[in-house]
């Protein structure tokens, strides 16, 4: 009985008549036999001697005539037949790629298609391997660029005969094909792996990117160490071993050295960065002991060359609870021997990762941060380092009782409190929050964990259902020819000035979730001198993008407009103005950008061996050139303005071992230097114009003093006062009348001022702040001390909506100015009131770029704005 596999299961067993012929053979046998007897009689002793000589011969031949064998090594049995000795017939299996995944189409309309091939059997991989030689990606939208096709090549496959396991391929080549040019090779990435043994399998030893001509652009080299591991209880010992091959040993193969090289198409590469790792080999568990880094190219694979910095790490553990590898001390030392950072940590080793204290050395002190935990491992309290007055800011956390994992309350040393509640435990989302000033915010979530609506204190007070709402349509409409209606999401912004007409934004995505179009409400004005003002409510549609064969934006078009009523219909229109065209190199960097007015910006990438930097040279449309030199850490080490009336202008930048900027030299040789402490805080700046300015700090990081070059002559400094980490005062040594004081709202403050700046006093007087429900400043009371005159007080008030748009402003003379917005959210009209109403601005008009095109003042004066259609410039 045979049950056939149909891919997703087996059919009902059937009787297969040919099963008896799965293996047939034929045999032929021949034999011959001869014998005779000879007798000799001896009468005297009555003995008779007889002998029976004989011989026999035979041979047989047996050969299969019908069998199932894997002849071609594809992993499937072939039919082998032979009816005579001189003939062999093979019927190859047609299974091949049958039942292998061919294509996947998701609900967004995207499809990726896979192909398969069988590698040629070799000595290293006798049976070969089914592999994926190509992958084609279709985003479902076919008028914005070609399909993306990637081809793969596999080499040096290895099967460990001893372990009977496939160790992988020694080399994998990824080829990006230009589907716009008949699948011509554009670039290839080559990854080489160590497959020499079971313990080293899968280690990446080399990775490079090349162009179609085989010129290398980048390369990464990795080197590994090999160790045998022996354990005595929880004490491990690692013994170096160049070749790892054992049936019983445990092995450790860590990364020792990494070098990154930049070629930019040249024959010789330049090392831009190196990293070297050292590990604990005795008494530990193979943790990282030290790490060295260099962007100078002088470190070497043994780590014995010059380096920028070295990070050394020490650990603690609790073997009885299998808690291992907790770092207790991290020290960063520069190549010059200077200690840049030193941080120590203390743990409660009864629990994993219960970090209880972090101590950072500052050079003239230390900064200590403490943590406390509950029985579930949640942080109960975090206490920050002390300020100059010994105050330590702390935060306490309380968790909801259902799951004991989500924070429901946060309190601090000021007595402030914020809360969260009504959790959707499916997704860990708090649906209700309360801020420091006791205002609530609500969030609606659907059954898929997506936010569908948000309400703030303004909406909760007025009964408005949302300030922002979201609608989702994640399933596209598509056929075999592509997407006909892309998936989209709608964002609604409630507009208090147009309560029946939300400001809406619709975002469309392609088959792989990439945003391809955004529509938004807008008002476009057609107005020019001598014509009638015309404003139309439309949807402004973002410009279409055309992608190249590698998913990069090759052409970017200007936006278009459409009439209302089609918000969820994908707009396929392309603007008539020439697009912005971008050309890229094989590393996906823009090399040429052509704007609609045909002006071009060119970018060239080269290397400079002298400074060991990547040089990026930009030439704009006017021929101006600037070169930027970047080191292996991504820091700018030099800029050169290569054109201009003053000739070449050069600025150089120097960094310490951990990439802090310490020296800037301009083209005339003027030098600015900076000095830092162990907390990365700048303690001194020496500027050629202003001289030396020094700063001091407390352990919390607050600036305590600032001393300029002029104040240093008198031995004086500007000082700063704090309450925990909040600035409360600035004190000037020579003019105390100019001192500044800051006052903040306490836990019972009114006017929504809890935790916010309430009053500032300075030499000119004072200013008091009042706030709205969402933290916006709604009123200020400014008191000025005018010499030889009375004290003057000025009150200014503002009203904002929940989108932080200014709706109304009341000046100190009680004039009220209101601001009106169009359906697209742009300012449209400004009107004033004082005794009577009058317009400041009657009308403001905009184009599809939301640039101003029209402005009419109350006196009838009109201003028209026109733009170059190609360059979009005035």
Where are these regions (language model features)?
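Repeat-based blade/solenoid architectures
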Residues: 20-34, 55-66, 110-115
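Beta-propeller blade termini
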Residues: 62-71, 99-102, 119-122
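Beta-propeller fold detector
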Residues: 12-19
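Structural motif
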Residues: 86-92
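Calcium-coordinating acidic loop motifs
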Residues: 6, 70-76, 95-96, 106-107
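Beta-strand elements of repeat-based all-beta scaffolds
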Residues: 102-105, 112, 116, 124-126, ...
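Acidic/hydrophobic-patterned starts of short beta strands in beta-sheet-rich repeat architectures
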Residues: 1, 73-82
């Amino acid at each position: 009985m045979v049950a056939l596999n149909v891919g997703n299961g087996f059919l009902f067993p059937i009787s297969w008549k040919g099963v008896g012929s799965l293996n047939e053979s034929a045999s032929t046998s021949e034999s011959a036999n001869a014998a005779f007897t000879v007798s000799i009689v001896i009468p005297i002793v009555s003995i008779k001697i007889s002998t029976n000589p004989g011989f026999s011969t035979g041979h047989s031949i047996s050969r299969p005539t019908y069998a199932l064998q894997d002849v071609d090594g594809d992993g499937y049995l072939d039919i082998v037949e032979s009816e005579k000795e001189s003939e062999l017939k093979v019927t190859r299996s047609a299974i091949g790629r049958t039942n292998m995944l061919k294509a996947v189409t998701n609900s967004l309309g995207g499809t990726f298609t896979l192909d398969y091939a069988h590698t040629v059997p070799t000595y290293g991989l006798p049976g070969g391997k089914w592999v994926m030689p190509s992958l084609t990606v279709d985003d479902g939208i076919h008028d914005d660029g070609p399909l993306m096709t990637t081809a793969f090549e596999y080499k040096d496959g290895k099967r460990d005969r001893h372990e009977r396991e496939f160790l992988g391929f020694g080399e994998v080549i990824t080829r990006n094909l230009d589907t716009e040019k008949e699948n011509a090779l554009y670039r290839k990435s080559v990854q080489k792996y160590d497959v020499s043994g079971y313990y080293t399998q899968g280690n990446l030893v080399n990775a490079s990117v090349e162009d179609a001509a085989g010129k290398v652009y980048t390369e990464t080299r990795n080197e590994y160490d090999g160790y045998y591991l022996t354990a005595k209880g929880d004490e491990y010992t690692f013994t170096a071993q160049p070749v790892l091959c054992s049936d019983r040993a445990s092995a450790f193969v860590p990364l020792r050295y990494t070098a990154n090289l930049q070629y930019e198409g040249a024959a010789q590469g330049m090392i831009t960065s190196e990293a070297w790792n050292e590990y604990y080999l005795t008494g530990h568990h193979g943790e990282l002991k030290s790490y060295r880094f260099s962007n100078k190219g002088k470190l070497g694979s043994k780590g014995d060359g010059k380096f920028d910095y070295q990070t050394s790490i020490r650990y603690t553990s609790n073997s009885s609870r299998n808690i291992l590898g907790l770092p207790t001390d991290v020290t960063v030392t520069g190549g010059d021997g200077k200690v840049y950072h030193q941080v120590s940590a203390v743990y409660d080793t009864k629990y994993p990762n219960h970090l209880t204290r972090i101590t950072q050395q500052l050079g003239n002190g230390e900064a200590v941060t403490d943590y406390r935990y509950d029985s579930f491992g949640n942080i109960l309290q975090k206490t920050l380092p002390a300020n100059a007055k010994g105050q330590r800011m702390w935060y306490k956390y309380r968790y909801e009782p259902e799951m004991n994992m989500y924070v429901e309350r946060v309190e601090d040393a000021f007595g402030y409190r914020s809360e969260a509640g009504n959790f959707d435990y499916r997704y860990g989302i708090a649906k209700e929050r309360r801020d420091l000033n006791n205002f609530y915010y609500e969030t609606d979530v659907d059954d898929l964990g997506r936010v569908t609506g948000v309400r703030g204190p303004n909406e909760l007070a007025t009964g408005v259902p949302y300030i922002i709402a979201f609608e989702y349509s994640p399933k596209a409409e598509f056929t075999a020819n592509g997407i006909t209606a892309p998936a989209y999401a709608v964002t609604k912004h409630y507009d208090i000035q147009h309560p029946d007409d939300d400001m809406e934004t619709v975002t469309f995505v392609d088959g792989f979730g990439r945003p391809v179009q955004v529509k938004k409400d807008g008002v476009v004005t057609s107005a020019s001198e001598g014509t009638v003002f015309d404003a139309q409510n439309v949807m402004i549609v973002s410009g279409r993008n055309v992608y190249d064969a590698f998913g990069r934006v090759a052409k970017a078009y200007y936006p278009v407009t459409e009439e209302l009523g089609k918000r969820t219909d994908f707009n396929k229109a392309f603007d008539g103005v020439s697009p912005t065209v971008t050309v890229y190199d094989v590393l996906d960097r823009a090399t040429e950008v052509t704007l609609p007015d045909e002006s071009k910006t060119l970018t060239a990438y080269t290397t400079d061996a002298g400074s060991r930097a990547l040089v990026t040279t930009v030439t704009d449309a006017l021929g101006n050139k600037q070169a930027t030199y970047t080191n292996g850490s991504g820091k700018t080490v030099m800029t050169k303005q290569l054109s201009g009336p003053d000739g070449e202008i050069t600025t150089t930048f120097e960094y310490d071992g951990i990439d802090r900027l310490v020296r800037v030299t301009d083209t005339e040789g003027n030098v600015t230097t900076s000095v830092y402490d162990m907390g990365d805080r700048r303690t001194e700046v020496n500027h050629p114009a202003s001289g030396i300015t020094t700063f001091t700090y407390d352990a919390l990081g607050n600036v305590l003093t600032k001393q300029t070059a002029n104040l240093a002559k008198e031995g004086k400094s500007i000082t700063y006062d704090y309450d925990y980490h909040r600035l409360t005062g600035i004190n000037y040594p020579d003019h105390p009348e100019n001192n500044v004081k800051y006052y903040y709202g306490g836990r019972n403050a009114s006017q929504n001022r809890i935790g916010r700046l309430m009053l500032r006093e300075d030499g000119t007087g004072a200013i008091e702040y009042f706030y709205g429900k969402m933290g916006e400043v709604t009123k200020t009371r400014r008191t000025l001390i005018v010499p030889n005159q009375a004290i003057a007080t000025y009150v200014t008030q503002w009203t904002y909506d929940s989108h932080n748009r200014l709706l109304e402003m009341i000046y100190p003379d009680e004039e009220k100015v209101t601001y009106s917005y169009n359906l697209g959210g742009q300012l449209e009209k400004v009107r004033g009131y004082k005794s009577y109403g009058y317009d400041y601005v009657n009308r403001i008009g905009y184009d599809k770029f939301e640039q101003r095109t029209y402005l009419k003042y109350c006196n009838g004066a009109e201003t028209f704005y026109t733009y170059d259609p190609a360059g979009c410039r005035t």
